[in-house]
């Protein structure tokens, strides 16, 4: 049996501002539904992903800005950093680690994201030697 993550809730203060932010960085706004006066659900999907995020009113009990540890895989960390900065997002990186190359950014509410370029595992021993890391 396959188990696949479908949605991750991201708590925000301003739904429209967050929707604009995520679409500006490349997410697709799949759904924007107001069910009633207490529930509005916006589903946004990163390019190439089968998993989406949802933002809105009444979708999570988390406080805005408290979602951390969301990580996406990108083909090239340098290009991802360049893209984010080109659309006005403050991002930091590229951090070169044995387990990948990372770029970090926050959404307007402070929810923290990491983008990971997967390493060439065939070069892991070389990386460890260059960085003085032993097992």
Task: Give, region by region, the residue ranges found by the protein language model.
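Short amphipathic alpha-helices within nucleic acid-binding modules
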Residues: 21, 78-83
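Core segments of cupin and vicinal oxygen chelate
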Residues: 2-3, 9-51
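Short, solvent-exposed beta-strand edge segments and adjacent coil->beta transition regions
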Residues: 3-7, 65-69
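Short hydrophobic/aromatic beta-strand micro-patches
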Residues: 9-11, 71-75
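Vicinal oxygen chelate
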Residues: 7, 32-33, 40, 81-135
């Amino acid at each position: 049996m396959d188990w696949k993550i479908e949605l991750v809730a991201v708590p925000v203060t301003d739904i429209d501002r967050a929707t604009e932010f995520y679409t500006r960085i490349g997410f697709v706004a799949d759904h924007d539904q107001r069910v009633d006066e207490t529930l509005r659900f916006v589903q946004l999907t990163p390019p190439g992903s089968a998993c989406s995020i949802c933002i809105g009113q009444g979708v999570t009990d988390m406080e805005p800005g408290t979602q951390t540890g969301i990580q996406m895989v990108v083909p090239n960390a340098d290009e991802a950093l360049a893209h984010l900065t080109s659309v006005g997002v403050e991002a930091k990186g590229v951090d070169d680690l044995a387990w990948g190359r990372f770029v970090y950014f926050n959404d307007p509410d402070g929810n923290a994201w990491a983008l990971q370029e997967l390493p060439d595992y065939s070069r892991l021993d070389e990386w460890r030697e260059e960085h003085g890391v032993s097992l």
